Amino acid sequence: MRPTSGITLGGRYQLTDRIAIGGMGEVWKARDKVLGRITAVKILKEEYTGDPNFLRRFRAEAQHTALLNHPGVANVYDYGEEKGSAYLVMELVPGQPLSSILEKEKVLSPERTLRIIAQTAAALSAAHAQGLVHRDVKPGNLMITPTGRVKVTDFGIARLADQVPLTATGQVMGTAQYLAPEQATGQQATGSSDLYSLGIIGYEALAGHRPFTGESQIAIALAQVNDTPPPLPDTVPAPVRALIMCMLSKDPRERPSDAAALSDAADALRRKDTRGAVEAVPALAAFLEEQGVADPSGAETAPLDYDGMRTTHPRAEGTRADGSPATAALPVTTAQPRTDDAARGTGAAGAAAACAAAAFGATASARTRDHEIAAVRDQQTRPG
């Protein structure tokens, strides 16, 4: 059945206007004739309804999202299959995707970026608490309401940590531009993988571009594994730069320990409370040193001017009085650079190539994947 305006699904959901077309389906605005409310209906494309794998994945999206009850996640109301079509009835979220905002505005302020990170991480924390990993966190899946609230959408490729994945062994679901290194090397995605993807979003919002680019999905996936992110602009306050680089660690153990901690750290930096951010994410201390800010527990501090975007931190002439509140800024020191993350993940080129080829759920043949893997290995071993 091809969706058109006026069609009623399940005897109840009358389609009115098409909102968007995605890779797997269409999203329509609809009126619930029973409850009288306006909803969003996601309808699986006809070419996929006959594919058992796609149908299972679509059902899984309904089941996964229905597990969650959080203001930062778009609610699922119903699911049905009718006349060869499968549909998912969801909360209609007003606003626009972050991808559209970034396309128009290019760069967001540190405060606005931190707010998006904090709210998204809080929603992901609710998903992770249910054992649910999103696996495709990207700007297009973050709806921003007119009041600035974030709603995480599209759990279509999410995976419960204790269930067998629907994808084939060695195949990756996700978008290469936001793919965590462990996903790009064929390892199982975890909650930390979602935080890495959110770090890419934060970088893009602050810099106006993504940290890794390439001529193909394979090249971008390899960059996620092997390359160090370019420094963020100096106009971004050092503690904010440090948080983003912490999220973009190649080693998941160097990222924030969980989404709730990340949300707390981002909120702390919004309050200009660097010490509070380090208490939430202890791993952040090493990245602060890398940005020229050291000793989060030290007594000597100078205020951080977020409004003026001052990123140099002259040492305060005196120390804080006993009992005074912790400030957001920290003294300057000459930091020793940490070991380059690019050294990590070597030897994973073949897996990264296979993952990039399989992005968006593509089902490349074994012969094609072998050819791609060989090409990437040849590229890495070629002199010069």
Can you say where each PLM-predicted feature lies in the sequence?
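C-terminal or otherwise distal, non-catalytic regulatory regions appended to signaling enzyme catalytic cores
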Residues: 296-384
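Eukaryotic protein kinase
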Residues: 1-306, 311
